């Protein structure tokens, strides 16, 4: 967000180990039994009353326990990974329209059934190993999406 000129305030909702789902095992590899789950609500600075601009949930390998040394209300996940030589080399993003269910609409301060954009990112290192899987839910009425492509 900062790179796009948006200052944000972050609220950490969940930061813990959890059993990997089948979907996460498929992405991280069959040896992945547990992952670290980091869920955050992000608000535009000084706009707390307007509601969050994104609900982001990141899943990282169980071995990345160094992450628990960080305060993610202030620290950047990207910076924490770089500081531990977890350099992002490639990223795949999938964008899907989403109708907010009860939990998400409550967290986002929106009506159930409101529209959002779900962006799922899979980040890999230069060896093709998955560094993180992140699901970000952006309510459409609070966000604008612009793609600039060179042809």
List where the protein language model places each region.
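Short linear motifs at protein or domain termini
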Residues: 1-6
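C-terminal all-alpha effector/ligand-binding and dimerization domain
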Residues: 9-151
